Amino acid sequence: MLALGKLLDLTLAGREPTEKIQLTADGTRLHWLAEGALEVTPIGARDNGVDLLLSAGIHGNETAPIELLERLVRKLASGELKPAARVLFLLGNPEAIRRGERFVEQDMNRLFNGRHEEGSGNEAFRAAELERLAQVFFSRGERDRLHYDLHTAIRGSRIEQFALYPWAEGREHSRAELARLRDAGIEAVLLQNKPGITFSAYTYGQLGAEAFTLELGKARPFGQNQQVNLERLERRLEMLIDGSEERPDGAHLDGLKLFSVSREVIKHSDHFRLHLDDDVANFTELSPGYLLAEDIGGTRWVVDEVGARIIFPNPRVKNGLRAGILVVPAKL
């Protein structure tokens, strides 16, 4: 196997490879672009016009997606997987990955779409670098652009594997992409309704890619992800890479749950109180009339939506940031 196939080992060691460009026996090109960044280019005769960006490790302790990308990289470097798509692999937050921590100074997945310009430190610099790498990768015209940003969650979930589909002015959510997610094992999709500051929101809104944040289970350390079943997703990614996928038309979305954002719960002060157990699972249902949260000045969040569920509850975020999202069932 080519040395560049050990992308995770290089990243964990903080080393640059001696050879930054290597070719497999059949001519597939591997190019180390920066720390944790590897571009894979198929031979011209096999190129099917798809540009696929796969990112993981934006939060350094979310290891199952990192291990998944490592398996794909090794298969490509050994020649076991022969690409028809161009692929860019990005391990998002190398220093946090080395430490086994969610982040070092600040949550990187809230630093995109220009937010990094307002900050400083390692994560802000890296977010800007990831934007640049994605922009260059998606700069070729007349190609299909797809980005999956892979995560695992801090907490458990009533719906274990789900996706967040960004929003941008003038763009419609793709039924074909939703069907592709369902076929990859994704059980539910949250359709967002305003611009975001995540990595997938950037590639969707600014670079014209179909882009998704995928939540794939609960975060665990390296080597302890046996309970995170990514077999369907891994097989779908392999088919996307080697061009063997039969793309669904999206006429039917049976088996896929759709949700939309009803409200975001914003923490305004240190007096903020979220009236949920610390271990409450994502997609826990909340009844109308339930007092969800309180904050300074008599601010109260009372559930008035039918079928409401909570995702990403986190009362420990900094003031001014989102401490949870209320979602409701949706149709496309």
Curated annotation (Swiss-Prot):
| Active-site residues, Swiss-Prot/TrEMBL | 215
Where, in this chain's numbering, is Zn(2+) bound?
A: 59, 62, 151
UniProt key word Zinc: yes
- E.C. numbers: 3.5.1.96
The region annotated as signal peptide is: none
Keywords from the UniProt entry: Arginine metabolism, Hydrolase, Metal-binding, Zinc
Q: In which pathway does it act?
A: Amino-acid degradation; L-arginine degradation via AST pathway; L-glutamate and succinate from L-arginine: step 5/5
Q: Cofactor note from UniProt?
A: Binds 1 zinc ion per subunit.
SUPFAM superfamilies registered for this protein in UniProt: Zn-dependent exopeptidases
Asked if the record carries the keyword Zinc, the reply is yes
**Which is a Pfam family this sequence falls into?**
AstE_AspA_cat
Cofactors required: Zn(2+)
GO biological process terms, semicolon-separated: arginine catabolic process to glutamate; arginine catabolic process to succinate
Catalytic reactions on record: N-succinyl-L-glutamate + H2O = L-glutamate + succinate
Cite the InterPro entries for this sequence.
Answer: AspA/AstE_fam, AstE_AspA_cat, Aste_AspA_hybrid_dom, SuccinylGlu_desuccinylase
A molecular function (GO) held by this record is:
succinylglutamate desuccinylase activity
What CDD domains would the database entry show? M14_ASTE
Q: State the function annotated in the UniProt record.
A: Transforms N(2)-succinylglutamate into succinate and glutamate.
Q: Which family does it belong to?
A: Belongs to the AspA/AstE family. Succinylglutamate desuccinylase subfamily.
Protein name, per record = Succinylglutamate desuccinylase
Q: Which organism is it from?
A: Pseudomonas paraeruginosa (strain DSM 24068 / PA7) (Pseudomonas aeruginosa (strain PA7))
Per the record, the gene is astE
